[in-house]
């Protein structure tokens, strides 16, 4: 499956043709499909009547999925993502990026509705930009048993950003869990996560190691 990076690529059709030529079964999924699968994967084992807002930060887009466990959620895909921000930061400051993020979030009727609700709901974060914050904060190697279910505070996220922002890429590589392909995108990704919590006036987000892949498996085989 391919997500935002391929959906938005100028050479999307050429890329798909080349992959199919190799005999690989390949599908480009919509942001809505991506969000629904991530929501199902993250909430499948949840019980009760609590609502969840599942957040999946990607390279080109971020999916927000809202609803009760084991139901079809309301989904919106916003074109804010880590790779997209790396490119934008070549021409703007983080102060300008903050304004841009909040403007993009505010344009969504669904997100504005959720923001104004008086009902209780919990944030769940999936994918490496969010779950990886745990290991950056603790300075340890990746271990899903530690990150799954971890309640990540907004203070931890802000602390991670301040630390990462003041590091060179070579210094970030010394963080035990840091992958070489993430040394540039992790900084704007952490900033985006912080701004999302600020937008919804939330103090924490629960990390989940179960997301899109688990959601697809559940819908296909269960």
Annotate each predicted stretch with a short phrase.
Residues 4-51, 66-69, 74-222:
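Helical "lid/coupling" subdomains associated with nucleotide-phosphate turnover
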